[in-house]
Every structure is written in C-alpha cells, then in structure tokens.
Amino acid sequence: MTDLSDIRREYAKGGLRRADLPQNPMDLFELWMTQARDAELSDPTAMCVATVDEHGQPFQRIVLLKRFDDTGFVFFTNLGSRKAQQIAANNKVSLHFPWHPLERQVSVLGEAQALSTAEVLKYFMTRPKDSQIAAWVSQQSSKLSARQVLEGKFFEMKAKFAKGDVPLPSFWGGYLVRPSSIEFWQGGEHRLHDRFIYTRHDAEWEIDRLAP
C-alpha cells in the first residue's frame, strides 16, 4: 500500500464569516464563480455530478456547468448516458465544485429536472460545429471496440453535415438541478475550516455553520 499520510499543507487564504454571507446562496456562488474565473483556474465551471443506480451504487463524473441562476444549475448531456438513465430513475443528485487553488469547495444537493427541447436547442446551436457533430457520434457510456470506430463515425458525420446547420439529436438534452441545500467550504488555519450550509425551506434559505 502506498502511504500518502505525509502529504499535507496549511490553508491560509482567508476565512468565511456569518456576517459576510448574503441571504441568497446563489449570490455567494456567483461571487465565488467570478473569483474562480478571475483567478484563471483551470476549468472553473467543472463540477462533479453524482447519481445513484437502482442498486444504490453511486457514480461520479466531471461535467461542465453551463448556466446558473436563482432556480438552479444547468448542464447538458447525452440522454442515453448512464447519468441520464440514473436521473430518470432517481432524480436526486449532488454537485461538487473543487476550487483547490482558492481553498474553496461548494457542494450542492438537489433534484434534476429535464429541460425543454427549446432550451436545449438554444444552447446546442451555440456549440462549435465539431462539438455538435460529436454529439451525434457518441453513444455515451456504451462499449467501443476501438477508438478508430469513434473517429471513423465522426468523419462520416462531418461529411454528412458539411453544409448547413447540424440538427439537434433527439437523444441529447439537459437538466436544471434545483438545489435543496448548498454548502460553502473555505479552508482555514490549523484545519479549522469554515463551513456554512444553506438549506431551503419553501422560498426561504436557512443558514447554519457546520463544524469542520
């Protein structure tokens, strides 16, 4: 077994105080996202999306956040993917944003709601053309005999859609994750980290400090 117990560091970039918290957690998330982007972090919109299968087995994968507002967090995916199939059976999900260089994390619990075709199409048409074509090519989470099969299909579809717009695949969609709780974590000295959790009660948010 590889021993990693001596890998550690101190957290000293600043604290998080109750008096500094807005009543709406999305306001704090917007501030932290802006600061993550301004710090030029690698993939600041990358989030870990966790779902659970019918046996209670959790699965995680990195997905890019594409939009957020007071209603929640939006991402897009292949509707035949494992994550989409699991969401169809159990729409309770969690999201996690690991902004390590800023010594920050944000964890979200909520329910995923499918977006309308109009909303999906609006975003799909903003994607680069090669990305639109790739959406047609990949049967996400299915087994492949070789990468060449995938590449061959890509170039075949690229030739097919050489002229004109790429249509939206019927098996491609998106989700809005409506949060029931959002936790903000800020690293602190001596492992005395600051953790605050916002919990939704109807239209109001309750704020609690959690022990590190």
UniProtKB/Swiss-Prot annotation:
Its EC number is 1.4.3.5. SUPFAM superfamilies: FMN-binding split barrel (SSF50475). GO terms for biological process: pyridoxine biosynthetic process. Its cofactor is FMN. InterPro entries: Pyridox_Oxase (IPR000659), Pyridox_Oxase_CS (IPR019740), Pyridox_Oxase_N (IPR011576), Pyridoxamine_oxidase_dimer_C (IPR019576), Split_barrel_FMN-bd (IPR012349). GO terms for molecular function: FMN binding; pyridoxamine phosphate oxidase activity. It catalyses: pyridoxamine 5'-phosphate + O2 + H2O = pyridoxal 5'-phosphate + H2O2 + NH4(+); pyridoxine 5'-phosphate + O2 = pyridoxal 5'-phosphate + H2O2. Substrate binds at residues 8-11, 66, 123, 127, 131, 191-193. FMN binds at residues 61-66, 76-77, 82-83, 105, 140-141, 185, 195. Homodimer. PANTHER family: PYRIDOXINE-5'-PHOSPHATE OXIDASE, PYRIDOXINE-5-PHOSPHATE OXIDASE. Catalyzes the oxidation of either pyridoxine 5'-phosphate (PNP) or pyridoxamine 5'-phosphate (PMP) into pyridoxal 5'-phosphate (PLP). This is Pyridoxine/pyridoxamine 5'-phosphate oxidase. The gene is pdxH.
